[in-house]
C-alpha cells in the first residue's frame, strides 16, 4: 500500500522558533526584515524591532490574564503590526483569529462570538466604526486595541501605541512567566482559526496547529529550492487568508526572506517598481489582468512593435515546449530567444522590477493561456493547489518543470487520492516519492492525508465528520485527476451542473475558455437542472469604451444589465468563436450583459475573487429565468 516516506526536518517546536532562527542564525537581529510605506516614504523594521514589539505585547497580554489557547482576533489590513501581533500570539500559545476586513459587521460579530475571542485588534477608523455597530453582540471581547491613536479610550478601548508603552513597563514583571509560557508551546498546539469565506453558508473556523503550518513550509521549500534567504516578497493579498499567511508570513520567516507590504491593491504596480521583489503570491484573476494589460499595450497600435512582440511570444513558446519535454533548445532557437529577451522580455521584466523569480499562483484555477503567456516571456508562474483545511499547500508545479493547466506535484509529506464520485472506490493514490512524469489517472474527488491537514472545524463536530472518512482521508470537495504526474483540477464538486438532459458540466472550465476573449472580464455559467447553458457576462470596460466610446448611458444608469443589442452582438462574436473549442452541450445558448462587475464589496465574490454561485443565482433569479422563458 502507498504510504508517506518520512522526511528529515528541523527541530522546531513553534512558529516563533522560525522567527528566532531567522533573526539569530540565518541573519542577525540588525538586519531589515520588513518594509512598509508611510507618508510616501518606504520605512523598514529589523528583526530586533519586531522582537522588541513581541516582548512588549507579550507582557501586555500576560497583564490582561490571557491563558494558553485563548483567542485573539485581528481585523486589519496587511501591515507590520499584524506581524508583531501574530508572532506574539504564536510565542504565547494563543490562537490567531483573523477577520477579513471586507466582511460585514454581522459576519465579523459571528466570527468573534464563534471563536470566543477575548481581544480584538482593529486596523483603522473605518473598521472600528464597523465594529462599534455590532459591539453589543460581541460579549466575549474584553479589550479592543485600535491602530490609530485617539479613536476611543476607556476601560475596554485603547490604542496600539499605548499597549506597547504599557507592555514595556510590564516586561520585567512578566519576563519569567513569558519564558515559561513559550517553553510550554509545542507543535501540536493550535496556531490559528481560519474562517472559510466559502461561496455558500456561514463560515467555519478551520483549526490549524503550529505543525500544520510548519510541515507546509518544509514541503514548500523542498518543492522549490530556488527560494532563499536573499529573497524579497511583496505582500498584497490579505493575511487573513491562509494562502498569503503561509506564503508571505511563515514561509518567508522560515527561509529568512524579507517582506515588503504593498500600500494597497491599486498601488501594487507602483510598489513593484519601487521595491523590486523577487517573489509574489497572486490569485489567478490578478494575473489575468496583468496578461490582458501587457498584451493590449503591446499589440493595440499594430505596426512593427506589435509584430516583434508576437514573434517573441512565439519564440518563447517554442522554447518553453522544448524545455518541458526535456529536449535541447537548439542553437538557432537559443539565438532567437536571446534576441527576444533583449527586444521584448527584458522590458516587460523591468516593469515587474527586474528581479522577479516567480509568481506563486493559488486560491483558484489559473487559465492555461495565462500561465503559458508568462512562461513564453521568460517569467515563471508556479501554480499550486490547496485549501484552508490543508494549511494550504497540497501540490505545486516544480521550479524546473511547469505543466500549465495542472497544479503540480504532490508535496513530500502528503498523500493525494482520487475517489470515484459514484462508487467511492479509490482510483489512484500518489505521493511525492511515487511520482512518474507520464502517470495519469481517472477523474474523481481529490482526497488528502498529511501533517498539514486541519484538526477539524471549531465547534462544528458534524461538519468535521462530513469531510473525514473512516480511513482518515480529508475530502476536499474538488474534482480532479493526475496528468503527466501532476494533479489537474477540474472544478469544485458543488459547482458541478447537471443539465436536465443528464450531462455533468463543470462551469469553471467553460468560463476559462470564454475568458480568453479580451472583451470579457467575468463569466458566470448557469445550467443546473436546465436543458441548456446560459451565462451572465461582465465585459471589459476598457475594451467596451474603446469599441463604442464613452457614452454615459452605457455606464451610468440604474439597470444592472446593459440592454444594448449592438454591445451584445460585439461580445457574441467572440463567444461564438471561442465556443468552437467546447462540446456542443457546453456551449451557452444565451447570456445577459452585467453592467457592474461582480465584487467582494457587492457581496457576490469571495476575498480570493471567486464568484459566490448561490448568492448570484438568488440575486439575479428573475433575469436568469428570463433567459429560459
PLM regions: where:
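Conserved pre-ATP/AMP-binding loop-to-beta segment of ANL
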Residues: 30-32, 168-195, 202, 226-232
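Conserved AMP-binding/adenylate-forming core of the ANL superfamily
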Residues: 33-79, 83-87, 104-109, 159-164, ...
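ANL superfamily adenylate-forming
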Residues: 39, 128-187, 294-345
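Conserved AMP-binding A3 loop
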Residues: 44-48, 183, 191-217
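Structural core segment of the AMP-binding/adenylate-forming
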Residues: 64, 91-166, 570, 576
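Conserved AMP-binding/adenylation subdomain of ANL enzymes
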Residues: 214-232, 239-345, 355
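Conserved ATP-binding/catalytic segment of the ANL
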Residues: 434-499
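Conserved C-terminal "lid"/linker of ANL adenylate-forming enzymes
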Residues: 497, 522-525, 569-629
